[in-house]
Amino acid sequence: GMLPGYIAETYTKTQTQIDLLNLCKFSNSRLIVDNVIGIDPTEKQVILKDRMPIKFDTLSINTGGEPNLDNIKGAKEFSIPIKPISKLVKVIDDIKRKILQSNEISISVIGGGAGGIELVLALNEYLKTIKSIKKIKINLISRGKYLAQAKNKFSQNCILSFLKDNKINVILKDEVVEIGPNFIKTLKGRIINSEFNFLVTPISPPKW
């Protein structure tokens, strides 16, 4: 939940991360750093790559979700998925370095839910601080009729008005079908120039 704050430079990277070692010490838990390669429900064991299996009575799986990159042509090569967060933080740092060397920037956020709205506003706040950029173009693209469809109509109108006041180009009722190195193509035939394309669409459980 602190990722938008990190992008907007409200928080440092350290503040956005949880120190697992200290957390485990505090909770009298054991921290094991390894890859899980299987689960044996019959024997009630978690199979690890480099260690002996771990027995369990109850197993909680908290690996997070992944975006489906197969539905959009070029998404695997040219999009920036919002999940997993650990990878995104590294990508954000690279993007910020590129932005500091630019005088024009075009960014698109694909997904009109709360996560997409948070992200687009955080990016906008960050870009306002970069004095070297002369031209900023930010797009928010959603296939829905409204932004933040889980919210009530009043909230949706307030969000849309705030985005427009901040000169963010909002595209509704259209769907991204292709992402290229410097462009986005939509189902309705729009070709949008966009250098950095963030994917904040619904996530699925990991394929494993």
Positions of predicted regions on the chain:
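Short acidic/His/Gly/Ser-rich catalytic and metal-binding motifs that mark active-site loops
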Residues: 1, 68-71, 207-208
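A Rossmann-like FAD-binding core segment of flavoenzymes
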Residues: 31, 38, 127-208
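FAD-binding core/adjacent interface of flavoenzyme oxidoreductases
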Residues: 26-108, 198
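Beta1-alpha1 glycine-rich phosphate/pyrophosphate-binding loop at the start
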Residues: 1-30, 108, 118-150
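Conserved Rossmann-like nucleotide-cofactor binding loop
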Residues: 66, 115, 146
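Rossmann-like dinucleotide/flavin-binding elements
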Residues: 84-139, 190-191, 202-208
